[in-house]
Amino acid sequence: YTGIGVYLEDKAVPSLAAKWKGKTSEELVHTLHFYRDIISGPFEKLIRGSKILPLAGAEYSKKVMENCVAHMKSVGTYGDAEAAAIEKFAEAFKNVNFAPGPLFLYRQSPDGILGLSFSEDVTIPEKEAAVIENKAVSAAVLETMIGEHAVSPDLKRILASRLLRIEHGIIV
């Protein structure tokens, strides 16, 4: 129901290549620590999503929040601050209804800031709809997409394959 793309700041390639150089994309796909290095890496990440079928923002955010809370509880990073940040996340999606096509974007900074944006077309909005300052919640959003219990195994495969190609100088 959702198309997802993950974009990494250009300095991600040398940062990741230092540790993962020489691995095949198949090895990377099955290496959780590779994805955890992406999630916690000292570079910006942009997650671009687009709905394929109509969906209420509240329904979408409920599932994302459930996955994030479950992950944070499993790794011991869920507390009062995270509960408050999750509520702010829910609030940002409350009045959003996704038609097929328009974008939602997550901007993740290395210092734990999660910016949320919504676009009625394919442009990136200049102003974010919400900013959540909580490193555990920010990391959990991407963790649920490419981590241990990923909602998108294809995204993991594509990410590993493209990073490997870029490392070898192949433009994708």
From Swiss-Prot:
Residues given in the record as substrate binding sites: 2, 67, 144
Enzyme Commission number(s) of this protein: 5.5.1.6
Entry's induction text: Induced during a hypersensitive response (HR) mediated by P.syringae glycinea.
Pfam families per UniProt: Chalcone (PF02431)
UniProtKB keywords: Flavonoid biosynthesis, Isomerase
Pathway(s) this gene product operates in, as recorded in its UniProt entry: Secondary metabolite biosynthesis; flavonoid biosynthesis
UniProt record, GO biological process: flavonoid biosynthetic process
InterPro entries, A to Z: CFI, Chalcone_isomerase, Chalcone_isomerase_3-sand, Chalcone_isomerase_bundle_sf, Chalcone_isomerase_sf
Residues the UniProt record annotates as site (Important for catalytic activity): 60
SUPFAM superfamilies associated with the record: Chalcone isomerase
Keyword Coiled coil: no
GO MF annotations in UniProt: chalcone isomerase activity
Reaction equations catalysed: a chalcone = a flavanone
Family: Belongs to the chalcone isomerase family.
Record's function text: Catalyzes the intramolecular cyclization of bicyclic chalcones into tricyclic (S)-flavanones. Responsible for the isomerization of 4,2',4',6'-tetrahydroxychalcone (also termed chalcone) into naringenin.
Comment field (misc): Part of the biosynthetic pathway for all classes of flavonoids, a large class of secondary plant metabolites, many of which are brightly colored.
Name listed for the protein in its UniProt record: Chalcone--flavanone isomerase 1
